[in-house]
From Swiss-Prot:
Keywords: Cell membrane, Cell shape, Cytoplasm, Cytoskeleton, Lipoprotein, Membrane, Palmitate, Phagocytosis. Residues 63-72 have a biased composition (Basic and acidic residues). Signal peptide: none annotated. The keyword Lipoprotein applies. GO terms for molecular function: small GTPase binding. PANTHER family: CDC42 SMALL EFFECTOR PROTEIN 1 (PTHR13502:SF3), CDC42 SMALL EFFECTOR PROTEIN HOMOLOG (PTHR13502). This is CDC42 small effector protein 1. Gene3D superfamilies: CRIB domain. InterPro entries: CRIB_dom, CRIB_dom_sf, SPEC. A lipid is attached at residues 10-11 (S-palmitoyl cysteine). Probably involved in the organization of the actin cytoskeleton by acting downstream of CDC42, inducing actin filament assembly. Alters CDC42-induced cell shape changes. In activated T-cells, may play a role in CDC42-mediated F-actin accumulation at the immunological synapse. May play a role in early contractile events in phagocytosis in macrophages.
Length: 79
């Protein structure tokens, strides 16, 4: 009888869940931008060492004034 329970125990073992594979994205799945609006251009010299942080605030202010966005720009991330 113990042989029966041993064999039954081998069949009842919990099987690990299969890992979900992430779908790979290729370029055919990506379309053109829908609501792209070019607000400003920042050159590498404009974000220089001296006034880089002050310039960042000015750019954010300019971006805020460009359009009535539903989502306000976040200032929570420090540079």
């Amino acid at each position: 009888m113990s042989e029966f329970w041993h064999k039954l125990g081998c069949c009842v073992v919990e099987k690990p869940q299969p890992k979900k594979r992430r779908r790979r994205i290729d370029r055919t799945m990506i379309g053109e931008p829908m609501n792209f609006v070019h607000l400003t251009h920042i050159g590498s010299g404009e974000m220089g060492a001296g006034d880089g942080l002050a310039m960042t605030g000015a750019v954010q202010e300019q971006m805020r004034s460009k359009g009535n966005r539903d989502r306000p720009w976040s200032n929570s991330r420090a540079l």
